[in-house]
Amino acid sequence: VIALVRTDQPGAALSDDWNGFGQRTTGTGTTVFTDAVVKTEDVILAEHRFGYQTAYYQQVLLATLAGIARSAANEISGALRGRARGYSHGAAATPANDPQLLAVVGEADAVAFAAAAVVTRASQALDAAADAALARWDGGALEVDYSTSPQDEEAELATARGQVVLSRLVPESATRIFDALGASGTDTGKGLDRHWRNARTVSSHNPWVYKARVLGDAAVNGAIAPKVWSVGTAVPQKTA
């Protein structure tokens, strides 16, 4: 079953104790429930959840990665534009006219464009899944069967594809931008390292390696992608 638990009650204690080096507000802190009150209507069977739920959650992370990519590209563009210091063995008198440095900025811009395109395509798949779910809905509450549909499957695969690609492209791009600035780009006052830290943190919340396996299994064996999964510490099985 799945339970919706209100956190504005004495039985719920939320702790902002996550100390990751990057993106904040990712909901990674500790939550402890002690005799928390749950209303009957807030308890549903797992099969009654909407089938594209995990894809929807992943889309939030993909959109965040796309935003990081665009922010990094925009910031490096402005930084190179205003850079006066250059190298004697560079390809131009000023950094802003150096074709090699311009190529670095161009790659960052291309990654940001690709990330936005991935998010848009995944959004279309999610829209189709939501439309299909609404078409199946009979107006009831707990009795509705949100069993997996072809649209749910496509939404799951679309976000998985995006995750596999962006989890590598965006952190790599956030590292490459420093090649356009030299050592001055590492000045703590600029804070350019935050783009990599944020991208790396977001990408780590749901490891892409598992989604790559799911995509391969679907492509080769026609396997259905898992829609319900969890993370936590495995409980050792008792032996006789």
Predicted regions span which residues?
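A short core secondary-structure module
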Residues: 1-13
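Short beta-alpha junctions and helix-cap segments that line functional grooves
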Residues: 15-19
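Hydrophobic packing residues in well-ordered alpha-helices of helical domains and bundles
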Residues: 62, 105-108, 152-155, 159, ...
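Charged, amphipathic alpha-helical oligomerization/scaffolding segments
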Residues: 68, 75, 107, 111-114, ...
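Charged/polar positions within long, soluble alpha-helices
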Residues: 74, 78-81, 117-120, 124, ...
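Glycine-rich phosphate/cofactor-binding loops in nucleotide/flavin-utilizing enzymes
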Residues: 179-240
